[in-house]
C-alpha cells in the first residue's frame, strides 16, 4: 500500500517528534518482508501508518482546496499505492474529495469502492481496458467484459457504485462493434439495477464480521494482491471475501484491537470469520496469546454466536496448541509434537 516507499529524512524527523521515540529502519524493513498485509503489524509500524494518514490527508486537502477554488470537482483514482489515503479510516473524510473511482476486477474490488463514505459519488472502471493485450486480432474482449460484469454484478446488488465506465484507447474498441454493443447492454442493465437499489437496504440474513489484525482499514482488501489477480497461495482465502461481497449478510471488518477496546463489540454479531494461514495478520498470530481475546471469542460462541474458520484459524504455536481455538473448532493441527 505504499508506506514502505514513503520514507524520507523530513518524514522521519516529523515522525520522531510526534511519537517521542527514534525511528529504526527495521520498522520498515521488517526482516525483509516490508510489512506486507500478511505480516502481523508491529506497534511502531501502526504508529507510522497513523502518522502518514494524518500528514497525507493534510497535503491532499490542500490539493483538493485548489481544485475546488478553480470551480472543479476533485476525484481520486483508487490505485495500488495509497500511502495514507485509507478510504475506510477517519482521516480520509477530512480530505474533502468529491468522488472516488477505481478499477473493478471482481466483487471485492467493487465493494472496496462502493463502501467508501464521505464522498458525493463513487465510480467503477470496468474491464477490459481498451489496450492491445485484449483488443487485437483474435482477441475476445466480449468474453472478458462478460466475466467482469457478471462477477461484479453480485456486489452491486448489495452496495452499488454510482457510476460505471471503461478506459483505454477508444479507437481499439471501435474495431470490435460486438464489444460496443455488449457495453451498451451492460450500461442499460446497470441503470436498471441502480434505480431499484440506490438508497435501499438489502435484505440481510445475518451480521457477519471478518476478524483479523487490520479490521476496517483493509475492508474488502483482505488477501487481495495486485488488484484481485489469481494466486494459488491465497485463492481460497480471497474467495471467502469475494463470496461475502455479494452475499445477503451485513458484513463488517473488525480487528483484535477493536475487541480489546470494546468489550461489547461482539454482542451485535451473529458470526465471526477468521480466514488465512497461521501466524499471519489475517488469523492473528501473537494476538492469540492475549487471554482477553481468546476468552471474548469463546464467550461469544458459548452464547450462541457462530465462528467459521478457514485455513488455520487462530493458528499460533502457544501453550501446547497450534490452533488456539482448538476446543471451539473441535480440531487441532498436528505438527509432530503430539505424536506420543
Where are these regions (language model features)?
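Polysaccharide-binding and catalytic clefts of secreted carbohydrate-active enzymes
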Residues: 1-97, 103-112, 198
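A short helix->loop->beta-strand "cap" motif at the edges of active sites that frequently abuts
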Residues: 71-72, 119-120, 303-306
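Acidic (Asp/Glu)-rich catalytic clusters
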Residues: 91-94, 110-122, 156-159
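Aromatic-Pro/Gly-enriched surface loop or interdomain linker
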Residues: 153, 159, 181-269
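A glycine-rich, often tryptophan-bearing local segment used as a flexible ligand/cofactor-contacting loop or short
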Residues: 283-340
Amino acid at each position: 500500500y505504499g508506506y514502505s516507499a514513503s520514507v524520507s529524512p523530513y518524514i522521519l524527523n516529523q515522525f520522531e517528534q510526534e511519537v517521542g521515540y527514534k525511528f529504526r529502519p527495521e520498522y520498515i524493513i521488517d526482516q525483509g518482508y516490508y510489512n506486507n498485509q500478511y505480516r502481523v503489524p508491529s506497534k511502531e509500524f501502526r504508529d507510522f501508518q497513523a502518522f502518514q494518514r494524518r500528514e497525507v490527508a493534510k497535503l491532499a486537502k490542500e490539493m483538493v482546496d485548489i481544485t475546488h477554488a478553480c470551480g472543479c470537482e476533485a476525484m481520486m483514482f483508487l490505485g495500488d499505492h495509497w500511502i495514507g489515503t485509507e478510504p475506510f479510516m477517519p482521516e480520509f473524510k477530512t480530505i474533502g474529495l468529491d468522488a472516488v473511482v477505481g478499477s473493478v476486477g471482481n466483487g471485492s474490488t467493487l465493494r472496496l469502492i462502493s463502501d467508501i463514505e464521505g464522498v458525493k459519488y463513487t465510480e467503477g472502471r470496468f474491464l477490459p481496458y481498451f489496450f492491445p493485450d485484449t483488443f487485437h486480432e483474435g482477441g475476445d474482449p466480449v468474453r472478458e467484459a462478460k466475466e467482469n460484469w457478471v462477477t461484479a454484478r453480485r456486489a452491486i446488488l448489495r452496495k452499488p457504485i454510482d457510476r460505471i465506465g471503461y478506459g483505454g484507447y477508444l479507437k481499439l474498441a471501435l474495431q470490435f462493434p460486438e464489444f460496443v454493443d455488449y457495453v451498451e447492454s451492460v450500461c442499460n442493465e446497470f441503470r436498471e439495477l441502480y434505480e431499484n437499489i440506490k438508497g435501499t437496504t438489502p435484505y440481510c440474513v445475518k451480521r457477519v464480521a471478518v476478524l483479523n489484525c487490520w479490521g476496517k482499514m483493509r475492508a474488502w482488501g483482505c488477501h487481495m494482491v495486485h488488484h484481485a489477480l489469481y494466486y494459488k497461495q491465497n485463492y481460497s482465502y480471497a474467495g471467502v471475501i469475494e463470496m461475502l461481497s455479494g452475499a445477503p449478510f451485513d458484513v463488517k471488518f473488525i480487528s483484535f484491537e477493536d475487541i480489546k477496546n470494546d468489550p461489547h463489540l461482539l454482542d451485535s454479531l451473529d458470526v465471526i470469520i477468521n480466514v488465512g494461514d497461521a501466524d499471519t495478520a489475517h488469523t492473528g498470530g501473537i494476538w492469540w496469546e492475549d487471554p482477553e481475546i481468546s476468552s471474548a471469542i469463546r464467550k461469544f460462541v458459548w452464547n450462541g454466536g457462530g465462528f467459521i474458520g478457514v485455513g488455520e484459524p487462530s493458528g499460533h504455536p502457544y501453550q501446547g496448541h497450534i490452533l488456539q481455538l482448538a476446543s471451539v473448532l473441535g480440531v487441532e493441527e498436528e505438527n509432530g509434537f503430539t505424536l506420543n
